[in-house]
Amino acid sequence: MEFKYILVMVTAPTREVGQQIINMLIEKKLAACVNMISPVNSCYLWKGKSYEEEEVLLVVKTRAELFEDEIVPAVKDIHPYDVPEIIALPILMGSQSYLDWIGEMTER
């Protein structure tokens, strides 16, 4: 099944970095809306060691067709992590007017 709209989740080390990513996504019309949730506690493994960090979580509403070729490279270009979290989940259902708005705001 193919999905038209997705939620993209991106973690960032600080609110400032998160805001830079938000501004870029909105300016380039790669996202209709981005929520910043702060702080979030992240526990992860990196190079054989366990870490616990405070981060911010961005929740991006966008079109699925923009993910791989545009959103991922654009976020990687400005993200300070070697391997940033950039994952997408399909929007299975939603208010049709909201979904239409996502489409309109990301149309170029």
Where are these regions (language model features)?
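Positively charged, small/polar-rich N-terminal and surface patches that mediate targeting and assembly
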Residues: 1-108
